[in-house]
Amino acid sequence: NEEDNVGNEVVNAAAIAENNNNGAREVEEGDHDVEDNMGRIVMERIRWPVQDLQKGCKWTTDLMANFAIYFGHILSTSFYPVLQRAIGVGSAFEGWSPRERDVVYRVLVPMTPPRGHTFHLELDTAGQRCVRNFRVRVQLECTCTGEHQGADMLCFLHHPEEELRSNQDPSLLHTLCTASYLDVQKTARWFYQLVRAIWPALPQSHTWHLVLLPSRHSCQFKVTNGRESFRIEVLFGVRQGDSDVFVSSQPREACTPSTTWPETYAVAEVKFFKYIARRVPPDSLHLKCLQFFTRLQLGSGFSTYTIKTVVMHLLTIIPVSRWRRRDFVRRLMDISENLRLCVEVRRLNHFILGNRRLPREISLPPEVQMSRTCNLFHHLVMDPVAHSQAMSEY
């Protein structure tokens, strides 16, 4: 579709033009020295996050691994969702942060149905552009035969209700669901109770203090030891098949119904940044470019996700060898110019939806990979005032 390709063509044209214009200069060593020195001067004047992101990510990963061990023990015979090992998502696990302080370490905990239950994802056709909303319908399944037979479990479908009430815990339908659908807020409250109960048994509790923070759609907490602290947010999700796309508890709007689970591409995006990290030179500054430009735009009309999308597109176009210190200023100019061009033509393609050029290790459901590309700037098409305001940012 011609319209769908406009955004990528804008990015392609700008990047190629920039590289062609500078190709001759890059061959000369003298220019390399000047550009490298300029990049060094700019970087020295930038304030990077105080916290060591790699250290914070490792600490968070270790903590969630310990939680997972206890989740397995406590929930193995229950009828609550089965909690899988947490997956680090978001900017910190991608290797950057838009803020100097108050870094949030975000993880996604995949959930699978407990025995005697199945999950079915139902697409909400009333979803907005670029955001597919789902509901997770919970159904009971017969356990009279098969792997659960004789496993000290009564069949929810075929045993009398009186016998079930007297001899077995209630099904998931009666604990975390609203009208047969998994409820985000009930799930969050349940997870808070788990964290509060398990924390004293963890080795981290001996030297760290846990403070639970309020949230209706996730579990947020801060851990401190007097010298340093980490803020962690735990999201819950259900995987779509065997792909890297989930439906998650993170809402896109303030008034999202509690049975709505928006589609999230956070795991796929983390895998993309890991793919890039394996291919760039050791001194690559692609993350610092993203970090600096995002911080530059804080408080403007452009979201962090918009800037990240522009950079992800550029990372697939500009060779990985051209993100070194000597290229730092030029890459910042690329990001700025590409953002301006996308605003001007009122089109910025979503990086995951409909992108058929992603690395093979990123697994997408067929309907996501083959879908029509989604314009993140659709609101600028519909609202001339918003478009004029966005242009004025430059």
Question: What kind of region is each of these model predictions?
Answer:
Residues D102, L121-L123, T207, S248-Q250, ...:
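Generic preference for flexible, low-structure residues
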